Regions:
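Conserved N-terminal Rossmann-fold NAD(P) cofactor-binding segment
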Residues: 2-31, 40-48
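Residue-level recognition of the N-termini of beta-strands and the immediately preceding loop/turn
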Residues: 16-20, 78-79, 103-104, 132
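Structural signal for conserved beta-strand scaffold positions within catalytic alpha/beta enzyme cores
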Residues: 22-24, 107, 134-136
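Redox-cofactor binding/interface segments in oxidoreductases and associated redox assembly factors
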Residues: 34-36, 82
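C-terminal substrate-binding/catalytic lobe of Rossmann-fold NAD(P)-dependent dehydrogenases
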Residues: 98-104, 112-186
């Protein structure tokens, strides 16, 4: 119920009327989307040093096992959106266990990492995020990478900007930006 109240408070930012309440698995039957956002709050392993999103796999799958079947059994035929870490592995697990087609089980993957990358680049350059095109690719975790040859600011490739304006951009430490992006949010 507390989570439902928190979400109900947040709907003031939405442009249309939304009703949120505490429910049961059977309520999923008529839902268009179910967001899977489970985490093991007893340990908080990502809060400890030298841990990764993959360290959450065992406790997360343990929780997922108890919810996917009841949701599917309710008659739910919508879309699963997965944000639980490790999101790529958990998304695949839910896809396999639900029996849903691939296009109905979606993980956020590196979409969030890409927006974080744009924010970090904005902070480092002083240029608005809206003018930055950048994508983090691969697994949402330690193996993600940034294809710098495809990053642009105001339509100009960032590698050209660094080369053409060394006094302004030579301090950009691209490997450090990638590492910062990987560790943000954990």
């Amino acid at each position: 119920k507390a989570q439902a109240l928190d979400l109900a408070d947040a709907v003031s930012y939405l442009p249309h009327k939304v009703h949120i309440e505490k429910g049961t698995f059977s309520d999923c039957k008529d839902s268009d989307i179910v967001v899977i956002s489970v985490a093991d709050s007893s340990e908080g392993p990502l809060r400890r040093q030298n841990t990764t999103r993959l360290d959450l796999l065992r406790p997360t799958i343990g929780m997922i096992k108890s919810i996917v079947k009841p949701i599917v059994d309710s008659g739910f035929d919508g879309i699963f959106v997965v944000i639980s870490n490790p999101v790529d592995v958990v998304t695949n697990y839910i896809w396999e266990k639900s029996g849903f087609p691939k296009n109905k089980v979606i993980g956020t993957g590196t979409a969030l990492d890409s927006t974080r990358l744009r924010r970090i680049l904005s902070e480092e350059t002083g240029i608005a995020q809206q003018s930055i095109q950048a994508y983090s690719m691969g697994e949402h975790g330690d193996s993600q990478m940034v294809p710098w040859s495809h990053v642009s600011i105001g339509g100009k490739p960032i590698l050209d900007m660094i080369k053409d304006n060394p006094s302004t951009y030579s301090n950009l430490d691209l490997p450090s930006i990638v590492e910062k992006n990987k560790k943000t949010g954990i």
